[in-house]
Amino acid sequence: MNAQTERLSLRGSAGVLEALRDAPVLVEGVPPRGVAVIAHPHPLFGGTMDNKVVQTLARSFVQCGWVAVRFNFRGVGASEGAYDEGRGETEDYLTVVTQLAQAGPLALAGFSFGSFVTAHALQTLWSQRTIEKIVLVGTATSRFEVAQLPAEAHERTLVVHGEQDDTVPLADVMTWARPQSLPVTVVPGGGHFFHGQLPLLKSLVVRHLSSTAT
């Protein structure tokens, strides 16, 4: 993805966690804006950190000056352990934050099952850290009980969903978002994986990351 990509092995509660860290190319002396941690879709349905939507999210953050960290949940790729229905995966997410984003600006992002995990990680992190940006794509509200977001987080949050998502129907996401008065950006004609619309998805994310709402 980038000339400054590192492959990392972290120690999680279930063993080794495999991760990739993509760093932006910046003018000398200019620090990154912060660290973004990005979670992949469902491990039992082929989800990995190399998923195209996850890569698109990483590229978006890197373009905007963030260090982007992708990782494989337990039991995926070289990550040890086994699928744990979101509980252990949330631990994995928090482990990555603790080890690779100990201080400084932090952004959270996820796709599908990864958005479910991200929302639950946010519940733990919100009172501990300043979360500057949150990006949830194809949020798996029809398959999991996705945590509501703190009201104070809404201005920092981008929720994107495809109009014709046949994996997680748009109506289910609206049912989750409505009680929170949480805006949802709908991609017309978009499916769950945004085939043919990844450039549009990237532009939406970049625009959100470039906004000053914090």
Language model features with spans:
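Gly/Ala-rich beta-loop-alpha elbow adjacent to hydrolase catalytic centers
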Residues: 110-118
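Conserved loop-alpha-helix segment in the C-terminal half of the alpha/beta-hydrolase fold
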Residues: 163-182
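Short beta-strand immediately N-terminal to the catalytic nucleophile in serine-hydrolase-like folds
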Residues: 108-110, 137
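Acidic catalytic loop of the alpha/beta-hydrolase fold
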Residues: 142-143, 163-168, 192-193
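Serine-hydrolase catalytic machinery in alpha/beta-hydrolase-like enzymes
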Residues: 10, 16-103
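Short beta-strand/loop motif that positions the catalytic acidic residue
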Residues: 153-154, 158-161, 165
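Catalytic histidine-centered segment of alpha/beta-hydrolase-like enzymes
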Residues: 190-202
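Active-site nucleophile loop of the alpha/beta-hydrolase fold
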Residues: 41-42, 136-144, 162
